[in-house]
């Protein structure tokens, strides 16, 4: 088992990474007599709910669960209310623990429920998708969507543990694996050129879910994110770099309707647009743009803007992005692979030109 620590003083927590961890009582920060509410969805529940419940009951916990509809389109206040109702009906108090068992959607909703219920209860992340394991389960971002924008209602709320069982990836559809690799590639692109080079060498091993490479990859991603979160927990500066591709990607998700493109797919295209824009602004070399496109393609990820979306369709969604300050668009761009920066008030004509360039790829 590998362990990465997120260092936040009294709110520090471990990220456990390994095979078969769901049935290991020692990784759960729980004790006899604790009440637990597991938040999951029916697909994940059929694989893992029973075994986790058995493990927690062996510890001596009282365990209940609530199952939410599946998909990004259900990351809503209505789903949040289902969790609150389940907690209240079962008389859960401020000493309860909420466990998020699922992908990024479940983690985001359950985390926001934990942050909100009776002004905050203990929260444990058990991410079951690659995207959630390397990104959304770490760092304390929780949220639900609004019809006008993604993740517009939320809070920073850290878990007390993240438990990553890499065997859960074996039950995922291949499309979900590929989507998760977008966030993996992002880490190399923004902060770690050596990791990017490692990914170029081992991307086929990761697609094939070879455990040795998977665990090494997940641990590296978690360490990069943990280091950034330690330095900038609430995204006042450096943490914004983790949003490479996300401003464009969120525009795609919102415009097409949540769930039509997976988050990682939209981020992949968003990273490609950001790379092309960086090149047009005189920063990123054409060779680095080509390397990024090749790696995304090897991960079976899209690099072209959706056929049904015009360049002008992006801007209204992008102006609702949480990084916008004083009405000015702020974008994460690249000087080189492994070196990202935040650009302020980039000329919209350059932005539109980059989107159009990526539209021509389709």
Curated annotation (Swiss-Prot):
Q: Return the EC number.
A: 4.2.3.4
Give the principal location in a single coarse category: cytoplasm
Instruction: Spell out the reaction equation it catalyses.
Output: 7-phospho-2-dehydro-3-deoxy-D-arabino-heptonate = 3-dehydroquinate + phosphate
Report the cofactor remark. Binds 1 divalent metal cation per subunit. Can use either Co(2+) or Zn(2+).
Residues given in the record as NAD(+) binding sites: 70-75, 104-108, 128-129, 141, 150, 168-171
Q: Any idea which UniProt keywords this protein has?
A: Amino-acid biosynthesis, Aromatic amino acid biosynthesis, Cobalt, Cytoplasm, Lyase, Metal-binding, NAD, Nucleotide-binding, Zinc
**What does UniProt give as GO cellular component?**
cytoplasm
Q: Name one GO biological process term.
A: chorismate biosynthetic process
State the source organism's domain of life.
Bacteria
Q: Can the keyword Ligase be found in this entry's annotation?
A: no
Q: Where does Zn(2+) bind?
A: 183, 246, 263
InterPro entries noted in UniProt: Dehydroquinate_synthase, DHQ_synth_AroB, DHQ_synth_fam, DHQS/DOIS_N, DHQS_C
**What PANTHER family does this protein's entry cite?**
3-DEHYDROQUINATE SYNTHASE, 3-DEHYDROQUINATE SYNTHASE, CHLOROPLASTIC
Function as written in the Swiss-Prot or TrEMBL entry: Catalyzes the conversion of 3-deoxy-D-arabino-heptulosonate 7-phosphate (DAHP) to dehydroquinate (DHQ).
**What's the protein here called?**
3-dehydroquinate synthase
What does UniProt list as this organism's lineage? Bacteria, Pseudomonadati, Pseudomonadota, Gammaproteobacteria, Pasteurellales
Gene coding for it: aroB
């Amino acid at each position: 088992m590998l362990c990465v620590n997120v260092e936040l003083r009294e709110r520090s927590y471990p990220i456990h990474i390994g095979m078969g961890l769901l049935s290991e009582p020692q990784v759960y920060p729980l004790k006899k007599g604790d009440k637990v509410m597991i938040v999951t969805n029916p697909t994940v529940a059929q694989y893992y709910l029973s075994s986790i419940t058995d493990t927690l009951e062996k510890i001596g916990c009282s365990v209940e669960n609530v199952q939410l509809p599946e998909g990004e389109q259900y990351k809503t206040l209505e789903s949040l209310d289902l969790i609150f109702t389940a907690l209240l009906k079962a008389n859960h108090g401020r000493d309860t623990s909420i466990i998020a068992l699922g992908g990024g959607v479940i983690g985001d909703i359950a985390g926001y429920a934990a942050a909100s219920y009776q002004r905050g209860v203990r929260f444990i992340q058990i991410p079951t998708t690659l995207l959630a394991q390397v990104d959304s389960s770490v760092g304390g971002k929780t949220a639900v969507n609004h019809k006008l924008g993604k993740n517009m209602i939320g809070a920073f709320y850290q878990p007390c543990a993240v438990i990553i069982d890499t065997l859960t990836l074996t039950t995922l559809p291949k499309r979900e694996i590929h989507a998760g690799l977008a966030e993996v590639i992002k880490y190399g692109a923004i902060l770690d050129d050596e990791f990017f080079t490692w990914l170029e060498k081992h991307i086929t091993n990761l697609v094939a879910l070879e455990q040795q490479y998977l665990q090494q990859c997940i641990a590296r991603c978690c360490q990069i994110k943990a280091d950034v979160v330690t330095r900038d927990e609430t995204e006042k500066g450096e943490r914004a770099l983790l949003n490479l591709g996300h401003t464009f990607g969120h525009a795609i998700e919102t415009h097409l309707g949540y769930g039509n493109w997976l988050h990682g797919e939209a981020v992949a295209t968003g990273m490609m647009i950001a790379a092309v824009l960086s090149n047009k602004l005189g920063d990123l070399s054409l060779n680095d743009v080509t390397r990024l496109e090749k790696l995304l393609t090897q991960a079976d990820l899209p690099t072209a803007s959706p056929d049904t979306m015009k360049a002008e369709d992006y801007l209204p969604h992008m102006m609702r992005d949480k990084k916008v300050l004083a009405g000015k668009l702020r974008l994460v761009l690249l000087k080189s692979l492994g070196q990202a920066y935040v650009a302020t008030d980039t000329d919209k004509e350059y932005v539109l030109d980059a989107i159009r360039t990526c539209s021509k790829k389709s």
